[in-house]
Amino acid sequence: KRIKNIDTQGIFVPGFSGISAPYWKPGFDDVYVELGSDPNQIIRAGMESIGFLFNDILNCFKSNGMKIPKTLTAAGGAGRPVLLQFISSLIDLEICYFDRKDRTAIGVYRILSGNHFKDESENRNRKSFKPKLLTYKNRKIAKWTETLINLNIKDNYSEM
């Protein structure tokens, strides 16, 4: 709720415990690009960094020939509407959120296997996040990528 209506031009790269997939870089200092001292903008940029990493992981899948389903599922800790809407808009895919505690394994199974079996119980208590136009999307992805390249986290010639 706190950052629902907050916009930021800045980028935050969380480094305290390192950066995870697809880069696997061990700990480094957090990086703030074009972020001032407004805590809400820093929180928003931190949330967006999760979306950018998710986008980079999907791009790895695509560059390795994996087909991404039209709808992704999320649950558990990912159940933050602002985050799920941002990711949906960033990757141009619908994301369905189920209120069951942990559906991570089923989501991974569906992505990797392409098996989209239907379980009618899944349709209960489901929220759907459809992509919305992000006017700044390409600019922010480019800034994220440039920041990772400047930090020697991402290869300049990588297809991700």
Give each language-model segment a name:
Residues 1-160:
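Glycine/Thr-rich phosphate-binding loops that ligate phosphate moieties of nucleotide
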